[in-house]
Amino acid sequence: MGFLTKYGSFWEMIPQTQGRIFWVAPAADYTIEGKSYSAANDNDGLSPERALRTIDYAIGFTTANAGDVIVLLTGAHSVSATIAVDVAGITITGIPSGVPAPQARSSGGGTLNRTTITTTETSGIIFTVTVADVEIAYLHLIPIAAGSGISISNAGDRAYVHDCTFRIGAVDSTAQ
């Protein structure tokens, strides 16, 4: 696999950007195209093979309004605290799953790949957006019963949330 971090990606579904693309793995050990890798916040995150471990750490690497993108690799991401999206002009996205993925990337049984984020907090929010021009896309958010998926403050002008699904209680809902 090549180390493409600009102008899209080898999967041709990641947003094209003039900024950097940071990759975040769902677990400490993860597999891409049949190869195993270890995620760590000591990695630079600039390639799927060198993915970061946490979303919050990836946000810290981004530059405001430079077109930086954070890609959450397919799988079940879990957070223990609210993620403060406090860098303007970034995109946080999962791998789009609107169409069946090629066999090299798809799960067994013909299911579509999906990037999920679950919180382990007793109450709270998964993402709190406090800056302008943030895009959040292609994620399945599973907040706890007393929480919510995304909170956008008054300063979160032009926030763009699309192609996300939310589990609310025992029922999934869709925002498009």
Name each model-derived stretch:
Residues 1-20, 63, 107-116, 140, ...:
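Extended, low-complexity segments enriched in Ser/Thr/Gly and acidic residues that occur primarily
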Residues 88-148, 169-171:
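Right-handed parallel beta-helix/beta-spiral solenoid domain characteristic of secreted/periplasmic
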Residues 21, 67-69, 76, 82-84, ...:
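Detector for repetitive beta-architecture
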Residues 22-27, 53-78, 91-97:
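Glycine-rich repeat segments that build the extracellular carbohydrate-interaction surface of secreted
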Residues 166-176:
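Solenoidal tandem-repeat scaffolds enriched in leucines and small polar residues
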Residues 1-57, 76:
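Right-handed parallel beta-helix/beta-solenoid
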Residues 55-64, 77-87, 102-105, 123-129, ...:
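Short, T/G/N/S-enriched strand-turn elements that build extracellular solenoid repeat scaffolds
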Residues 12, 26, 53, 67, ...:
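Membrane-topology and secretion signals of cell-surface/extracellular proteins
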